[in-house]
UniProtKB/Swiss-Prot annotation:
Keyword Amino-acid biosynthesis in annotation: yes
Transferase in keyword set: yes
Cofactor(s) the protein needs: pyridoxal 5'-phosphate
Pfam family, one: Aminotran_1_2
Catalytic activity, as annotated: L-histidinol phosphate + 2-oxoglutarate = 3-(imidazol-4-yl)-2-oxopropyl phosphate + L-glutamate
Molecular-function GO term, any one: pyridoxal phosphate binding
PANTHER family from the UniProt entry: HISTIDINOL-PHOSPHATE AMINOTRANSFERASE, HISTIDINOL-PHOSPHATE AMINOTRANSFERASE 2
Keyword annotations: Amino-acid biosynthesis, Aminotransferase, Histidine biosynthesis, Pyridoxal phosphate, Transferase
Protein name listed in UniProt: Histidinol-phosphate aminotransferase
Organism: Methanosphaerula palustris (strain ATCC BAA-1556 / DSM 19958 / E1-9c)
Pathway: Amino-acid biosynthesis; L-histidine biosynthesis; L-histidine from 5-phospho-alpha-D-ribose 1-diphosphate: step 7/9
GO biological process: L-histidine biosynthetic process
Residue numbers of N6-(pyridoxal phosphate)lysine PTMs: 214
């Protein structure tokens, strides 16, 4: 007899992955624009540092990731940082700190689906608060919903819409949610105009999550980190599984990547230029975005049909049908290298 699986795994949604390049390999070179990745290799210094760290992988990594957290302080200021296996790992640990069976978690949707999936895994009741028609956050509705909730998730720039919630709006939320912990997902903030770091010194119920998968190009190394209130750190470390941060190879590469300002600025300049060029060249309506991707309304076509058609032509993009509240007509495309972007423009305009 098979042991009983938890009901949320039987009935709830799982995370839907974007298409991988192997799904269209037979077409030749692939334009991989489905996963909001950096199209360029990481910093040469990061590659060298990661390779050098392989010599000591017989030893466990520093559980506090001291070298990396000190590098983060040099870049961001003297805050308290934790490091995790992608931001996903940090999200799960934060939820273990606060959530018990039946506790409420609030999510501003449509957004990154893992918030709700991870919260359900902790036994939470997940309340999705729909964004407005322009996909900006309904601040009053979101703030009201947070009353009595344990944790709330807000992504800015938002995945998959690219829309932003300004620091002033985030402050309004924080001023109105009492002791609810707000997890502010800043995965794409390097491509945006606003800076949310000044909020960290003002609120004891704010966590700001960030990643090195995007502008730093370390997606395959799974380096996430977060600014957390100092009071939370000992509880976070208790909730984390042993050595649940990142590998010593990933940590060494991350420290070197943080120091390579030229690589970061070169990537940003490319992304900002091509984000506008792609937006203006596509014949379908494109939402304003401050991320490294664009969301496009392909109606009257369905998102799945457009994604399948482009995949057959060697261009991989993401259907947004799996994001609750988005319907069947939106696709998301990452900003790639020049060749990838030109291929996408050519093929989407043939639809």
């Amino acid at each position: 007899m098979q042991p009983s699986i938890r009901s949320y795994l039987r009935t709830g949604p799982g995370y839907v992955y974007a298409a991988h390049s192997g799904t269209a390999r037979e077409t030749g070179r692939i334009a991989c624009l489905a996963s909001n990745e950096n199209p360029f290799p990481p910093s040469e210094a990061a590659i060298a540092a990661g390779a050098a760290a392989l010599a000591t992988v017989n030893r466990y990594p520093d559980d506090r990731m001291t070298d990396l957290t000190e590098a983060l302080k040099r870049l961001h200021g003297d805050h308290t940082f934790v490091v995790g296996n992608g931001m996903d790992g940090i999200i799960e640990t934060v939820l273990r700190c606060f959530i018990g069976h039946g506790d409420r978690v609030v999510v501003s949707t449509p957004t990154f689906s893992f918030y709700g999936i991870a919260a359900a895994g902790q036994g939470a009741i997940v309340e999705n608060i729909q964004r407005k028609e322009d996909f900006t956050v309904d601040i009053p509705a979101f703030t009201r919903a947070c009353t009595g909730a344990k944790v709330a998730f807000l992504c800015t720039p938002n995945n998959p819409t690219g829309t932003v919630t300004t620091p002033a709006e985030v402050r309004k939320v924080l001023d109105g949610i009492g002791d609810c912990m707000l997890f502010l997902d800043n995965a794409y903030v390097d491509f945006a105009r606003d800076d949310y770091r000044p909020l960290m010194g003002e609120y004891e119920n704010l966590i700001i999550g960030r990643t090195m998968s995007k502008i730093f190009g370390l997606a395959g190394l799974r380096v996430g980190y977060a600014f957390i209130p100092a009071w939370l750190e000992p509880f976070y470390m208790k909730a984390a599984t042993p050595f649940s941060g990142i590998s010593s190879v990933s940590a060494a590469a991350a420290v070197a990547a943080l120091a390579d300002r030229e690589h970061r600025e070169r990537t940003l300049a490319h992304m900002l230029e091509w984000r506008e060029r792609v937006r203006s060249a596509v014949r379908f309506p494109v939402l304003p975005s401050e991320a490294n991707f664009l969301m496009i309304d392909v109606a009257p076509h369905t998102a799945d049909d457009v994604v399948a058609t482009l995949a057959g032509r060697g261009v991989l993009i993401r259907s947004c049908r799996s994001f609750p509240g988005l319907g069947d007509h939106y696709v998301r495309v990452s900003i790639g290298d020049a060749w990838e972007n030109e291929r996408f423009i050519e093929e989407i305009n043939r639809i």
